[in-house]
Amino acid sequence: YAGNLENFKEIENNPNYKFIKCDIRDRKKIDEIFHLYDIDVVINFAAESHVDRSIEEPEVFLTTNIIGTQVLLDAAKKFWKVNPNDKYCKEYKPGVKFLQISTDEVYGALGKTGMFVETMPLMPNSPYSASKASADMIVRAYHKTYGFPINITRCSNNYGPYQFPEKLIPLMINNCLKEKELPVYGDGMQVRDWLHVSDHCSAIDTVLHKGVDGEVYNIGGNNEKANIDIVKLIIRTLGKSENLIKYVKDRPGHDRRYAIDNTKITTELGWKPVYTFEQGIKETIQWYLDNTEWIENIVSGDYV
């Protein structure tokens, strides 16, 4: 439901771009795609990702995020093996890689101090994060069992242009512009690290080309913020009243704080985030102001 072909307008005429609509769980279709195209890299962004929806409808998260990932793994393994007829073959075509895009939510919650590092055990607390943790473990198992070439990245909260308006920042911007209530869970003091989408993309590109086979890399923006502080910043920037804020009952199992240690990717692969939150949120708010038609199409459902 969150997919929008308008987001691909800039690249739709690129000869390297091909859009195929299908269900990630459809083994026959996925195999067909691998058969038709010379695919040497899979970057698996495909996922149900909204925690609230996972609480209401966990099954679709489990089947999409877990089974869907396994379907992709099986197809890639089959088409990338040097000897497809040898089920024990652990040799793959040169340059192939499966890059699983995951989330810091798989680690669970932190107290007032500390940060997530890649060696921490996975302790997910929502159906969404549990489904992503499960997918991560399956990807890892394919590497350990079949010698399959993989990397896993775990990022903090993303923000920036083109984000579906069920997410915190675009939701608050859109509601502010319409003078609608701004729903804030609990006391609003849940803390998240925020990563601009451009920084996330550059990190993924870095891991794709430099990542050590089998390794996990945390991707963080070094921008810890409480939810309520972000809401108030958006209100101030748009010149609205804090009376729009409505504190609502907290989400079940709501993690209090996430913080991500990105030392591994910065020291070993040479990546670092470019955006400060102050710069990124200013540009993001301006993008939504400049693209009201885009967000109206989303909210109205006309984009479907």
Identify the residue ranges that each predicted region occupies:
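Short coil/turn segments at alpha/beta junctions that flank glycine-rich nucleotide-binding fingerprints
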Residues: 145-149, 165, 210
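Short beta-loop-alpha junction of Rossmann-like oxidoreductase domains
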Residues: 110-111, 161-163, 167
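N-terminal Rossmann-like NAD(P)+-binding domain of SDR-like oxidoreductases, especially those catalyzing
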Residues: 1-158, 283, 288-304
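C-terminal substrate-binding subdomain of Rossmann-fold SDR/epimerase-dehydratase oxidoreductases
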Residues: 22-25, 29, 170, 176-304
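Short, cationic motifs built from Arg/Lys/His that form the positively charged side of catalytic pockets
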Residues: 132, 154-157, 162, 192, ...
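Activation loop
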Residues: 4-7, 103, 112, 168, ...
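Conserved active-site helix of classical SDR/Rossmann-fold NAD(P)-dependent CH-OH oxidoreductases
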Residues: 69-70, 133-140, 170-173, 201-202, ...
